[in-house]
Amino acid sequence: MTTITHRYADVDGFKVFYREAGPADAPTLLLLHGFPSSSHMFRDLIPRLADRFHLVAPDLPGFGLSDMPSRESFAYTFDNLANVIGRFTEVIGFERFAVYVFDYGAPTGLRLALAHPERITAIIACFSPGGP
């Protein structure tokens, strides 16, 4: 049985909830959810991959259990979501990782990949709109 831990990371004062499973020394895969969902959407996928991958599935800002600041205090743009998730990967110690993007997670993940291509080992796109 796969153990999935639930954690929070403080990203520059912003609380990001995430699910984590798999061996820390395995290849890392960042799972970015769609709209209007959360990391909970990966509840069936994580156990299927956790024997081979280190999996981390955050709730994007404003979704799930992550902080949801007002629109007046936080710009809910894909650029800003990518900045928060990029910092999130730094805070939790990711150096290089693959990114799995789904739907709304695609513009976020693709922007992250464009900003830091040296950190991205692969991009897996599922039901994703075109372009960053």
Which stretches of residues belong to each language-model region?
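Short, hydrophobic alpha-helix immediately C-terminal to the catalytic nucleophile
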Residues: 43, 86, 110-114
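N-terminal cap/lid segment of alpha/beta-hydrolase-fold proteins
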Residues: 1-15
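A structural signal for well-ordered alpha-helical scaffolds and beta->alpha junctions
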Residues: 2, 39-42, 78-82
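Active-site loop/oxyanion-hole signature of alpha/beta-hydrolase fold enzymes
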Residues: 9-12, 19, 57-102, 130-131
